[in-house]
Design a protein with these regions (language model features):
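N-terminal, active-site-proximal structural segment of metallo-dependent hydrolase catalytic domains
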Residues: 1-47, 57, 62
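Structured beta-strand-rich core segments of catalytic domains in phosphoester-bond hydrolases
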Residues: 37, 43-111
């Protein structure tokens, strides 16, 4: 199984630099992104053969995660159940028959 995790630091800018070609070339079974920095409806990716799951931050241009998987999961949960953290779109958990897959974009270590 091939897993890829990529902090894109803004998916819209990444798309203009050839993201979709690189995505196809890498041919991962599960591909996760952190720091997507987009809102629902701002990005439409054509990724045939993949199921797409997004967790958007409430704040525009901030954090956000996504997972693209060839196999459809049994369930998908956005967040960890703590509203203060979940509004930032930092976690997606996918349940598969034999394992759980979690992508996380963690905050930096600043004092706030």
């Amino acid at each position: 199984m091939k897993l890829i995790s990529w902090n894109v630091n803004g998916i819209r800018a990444c798309i203009t630099k050839g993201f979709e070609d690189r995505f196809k070339e890498l041919d991962a079974d599960i591909f996760c992104l952190q720091e997507t920095k987009c809102q629902q409806g701002q990005v439409e990716l054509e990724l045939p053969g993949y199921h797409q799951y997004w967790n958007y931050a409430n704040r525009r241009g901030y954090s956000g995660t996504a997972v693209f998987t060839k196999k459809e999961p049994l369930s998908v949960v956005n967040g960890i159940g703590i509203e203060a953290h979940d509004k930032e779109g930092r976690v997606i958990t996918l349940e598969f028959e034999e394992f759980y897959f979690v992508t996380v974009y963690t905050p930096n270590s600043q004092s706030e």
